[in-house]
């Protein structure tokens, strides 16, 4: 029997889903919803934080992508997510690296993907899963990574195309997604996290900025539509983050990426609603399915 609530998340690399939405995913799995993750690349260009695994990196053996499939599998087991896939199949699109790096020019880089082809792959998933809710990044990909921007483009175009009966009927019956959310962090929450790091004597990764308003992924609180409380599933998110060991170092309530600067692990995760109707007239929603039937 198909679960009545179905959530699809579209992300660029393994680990993005856990950092942005791990608590949300674990919560909805626990509540009996269908949670599907669609990851667009294997994350081949990521920096390796584990010294004994450094030779996996792109500049050495270039085997990191395959290793990260295993990390993603372990993370999904930690979150309880059974349905996780790669856009077009594992390795169809390669990690494009950070903006302005030589990896951007790789022919297989996701940044260079044929958008029509990539959208068709995503539409096939949307029409199969038939999610009421889709989660992805904003138009800047959160912080400007080429693959995040491309994941946004593919997800948003796929939502439109999947609803059009005239578009590729061979990919399944048309399906209209009721709500689309973009991942975000409210400015007030970022300020609190920076203050918490400072209280511990830790340097914030954003210390050089005059104000959190300058951060591309920090949004005014009034633009936030939902705050999903997943604190009851914090241990699952913590375990999933630890599963991505080549990319993330976890230390108590904080984590670090390759910059080795601490960020707070959020048990409550935040979203902007960009398609569909809010489920509550006042304040932030506490449920991405708020206002939907069933």
Swiss-Prot record:
Binds 1 zinc ion per subunit. Its cofactor is Zn(2+). It is an enzyme of class 3 (hydrolase). Its EC number is 3.5.1.103. The keyword Oxidoreductase does not apply. Zn(2+) binds at residues 13, 16, 148. It holds the Pfam family PIG-L. Keywords: Hydrolase, Metal-binding, Zinc. It catalyses: 1D-myo-inositol 2-acetamido-2-deoxy-alpha-D-glucopyranoside + H2O = 1D-myo-inositol 2-amino-2-deoxy-alpha-D-glucopyranoside + acetate. It comes from the Bacteria. InterPro entries: GlcNAc_PI_deacetylase-related (IPR003737), LmbE-like_dom_sf (IPR024078), Mycothiol_biosynthesis_MshB (IPR017810). One of its GO terms (biological process) is mycothiol biosynthetic process. GO terms for molecular function: N-acetylglucosaminylinositol deacetylase activity; zinc ion binding. Catalyzes the deacetylation of 1D-myo-inositol 2-acetamido-2-deoxy-alpha-D-glucopyranoside (GlcNAc-Ins) in the mycothiol biosynthesis pathway. Belongs to the MshB deacetylase family. HAMAP family: MshB (MF_01696). This is 1D-myo-inositol 2-acetamido-2-deoxy-alpha-D-glucopyranoside deacetylase. The lineage of its organism: Bacteria, Bacillati, Actinomycetota, Actinomycetes, Geodermatophilales.
């Amino acid at each position: 029997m198909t679960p009545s609530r179905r959530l699809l998340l579209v992300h660029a690399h393994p680990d993005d889903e856990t950092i942005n939405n791990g608590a949300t995913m674990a919560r909805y799995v626990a509540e009996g919803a269908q949670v599907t993750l669609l990851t667009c690349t294997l994350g081949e260009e990521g920096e390796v934080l584990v010294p004994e695994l450094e030779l996996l990196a792109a500049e050495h053996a270039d085997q990191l992508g395959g290793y990260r499939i295993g990390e993603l599998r372990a993370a999904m087991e930690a979150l309880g997510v059974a349905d996780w896939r790669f856009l077009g199949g594992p390795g169809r699109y390669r990690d494009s690296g950070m903006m302005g790096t030589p990896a951007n020019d790789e022919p297989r880089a996701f940044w260079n993907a044929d958008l029509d082809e990539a959208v068709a792959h995503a539409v096939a998933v949307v029409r199969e899963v038939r999610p009421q809710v889709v989660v992805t990044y904003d138009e800047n990909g959160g912080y400007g990574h080429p693959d995040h921007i491309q994941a946004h483009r593919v997800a948003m175009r796929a939502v439109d195309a999947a609803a059009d009966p005239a578009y590729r009927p061979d990919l399944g019956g048309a399906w209209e997604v009721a709500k689309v959310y973009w991942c975000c962090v409210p400015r007030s929450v970022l300020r609190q996290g920076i203050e918490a790091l400072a209280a511990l004597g830790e340097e914030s990764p954003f210390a050089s900025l005059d104000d959190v308003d300058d951060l591309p992924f920090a949004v005014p609180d009034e633009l936030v539509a939902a705050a999903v409380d997943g604190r009851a599933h914090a241990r699952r998110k913590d375990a999933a983050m630890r599963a991505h060991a080549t990319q993330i170092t976890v230390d108590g309530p904080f984590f670090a990426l390759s910059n080795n600067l601490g960020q707070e692990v959020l048990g409550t995760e935040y979203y902007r609603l960009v398609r569909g109707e809010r489920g509550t007239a006042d304040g932030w929603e506490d449920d991405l399915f708020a206002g939907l039937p069933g």
